[in-house]
Amino acid sequence: MNKILTIIDKEWAEIFKNRLILYTMFLMPLLFTALPLVMLGAMGGQSAGDVTDMPPQFLQLCGELQGTECYQLFMSNQFLLLFMMLPLVIPATIAAYSIVGEKTTRCLEPLLATPISTVELLLGKGLAALIPGVAAGWGSFALFALGAWILVDSPALLARLLDGMWFIAIGVVGPLVALAGISVAIMVSSRVNDPRTAEQITMVLIIPLLGLFFAQIAGVVMVNAGLLWALAGALVLVDVGLVWLGARAFQRETILTKWK
Amino acid sequence: MIQTTNLTKVFGARTAVDALTLTVHEGEVFGFLGPNGAGKTTTVRMLTSLIAPTAGTARINGFEVGRDDTAIRRSVGILTETPGMYDQLSAQKNLTLFARLYEVGDVPGQVEKYLRLLGLWERRNDAVGSFSKGMKQKLAICRALLHEPAVVFLDEPTSGLDPEAARLVREFVAEIKAQGRTIFLCTHNLDEADRLCDRVGVMQQRLLTVDTPTALRRQLYGRKVVFHLREVGAGLPALLQSFPFVKEVEQVENKLLVGLDDPDAQNPVLVRALVQAGADVQFVGELRHSLEDVYLSLIQRGTTE
């Protein structure tokens, strides 16, 4: 455990000196938090308009919410998916730098020469990437909840904005997405020499989430608690496979002798 | 302390290390010489359990490579070819991290001890990225010793250093030798090997030879004594050649180079003979071939065989 904490300590000491990662860690969550709050604030007090423009399935989900409140709920729900992306973007950036970065700074050999096991090393690096990502997701949601509580007058809308679906998305799906991103970053980093390449390839994982985002806007899919649990279940299976593949891809000897 | 038997490493179709059989004794400084690509770093990586041998066995401190890898990593220190420090972190932070990974008992104490020993204590809070190459190398040596390993592997410790920094590193290697540690020194610097090593091994995929630098010189060139004369008279080479113990005589300007087995006993006899023959002997000395001559000769032989 001590070695895992040492790796986390080392990773964070380096992360907090890397401006690019810091910007990703702080600016993106702030942006994702500010946008829905600005939207909620701007729409408050506006006239209802024609709610029939929204996907019919969503109108059903609005339930007792009418007019502007239904619009506010609809728009806020689009950002739910962006909140889920945060735990993917941040760990992917950190993991890509922390693993390939060891190679570019030629620190990997002395590190592997210590009595640390591969599991300890990967756990340390994985947790060092996962914790800030999940913390950023949860922190952003906490800020959003606080902002919504201040900005929204309607108790019915506030209750819908902070209902269980958000907690499933941020608390369960987000960390599972992050774990998938880290596993992919580890796999990619055992094959490439450049942290940016590892980061970019890992970001491909965003595509399914973006697909979900646009599908919801288009009314093809309605994100609800049932869909999120199904997504979480699928992600557990995907994560088990990716963690296993990531650990297998991290071959000490191959990395030492083939990374040039 | 280090014992290998037919240790072999094959990468695809290329044999990097071929049946290396070697023993390095406790407290010895063993120089591992060889050209680039000779398999020196691969050998060190196998002996430090970083990579697995394809065949053969190796034991370090009684632990077997491939079976007791964690114990081996705990008991050896390694200075890799490039220092590989975390440039954004301070010298103290770098060493503290590695001390914790090596499970050192008194982390702050050991870190301070080695930073002071190598004259880096005053710069302990500076980012390693601001250090000179020599300072980084010294810091990497500190890292290799933090857990007080019995065996230390040094891969090109003075490579790329200016003469002053290189001398400091050599002096430090001599110090850790005096502490009784076993040192496995890979180097291209033959002068360094000559000065520091008790024995050297010359490697070119396979081990060409192992011996003390002095014995290697004798093995290849025998012992030669140079007689400096004011003038070499016509009959003098033949006179020396007439002694049964003289192996060969070669004249170079006003010098006679004489091959002998036991110069301590045989020199006085030859000096007496030369003086009696009317030669003015200015001085007598032993011809020393540099380790570089020996090394190049061995490598050339190894290539042609």
List each language-model region with its residue ranges.
Chain B
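Non-catalytic surface loops within mature trypsin-like serine protease
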Residues: 26, 103, 122, 231, ...
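Short beta->alpha junction loops/turns
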Residues: 65, 230-232, 263, 287-288
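Residue-level detector of short coil/turn "hinge" positions at structural boundaries
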Residues: 106, 122, 247-248, 275, ...
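Residue-level "edge-of-site" marker
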Residues: 128, 254, 287
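ABC transporter nucleotide-binding domain
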Residues: 170-261
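C-terminal coupling/interaction segments
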Residues: 263-305
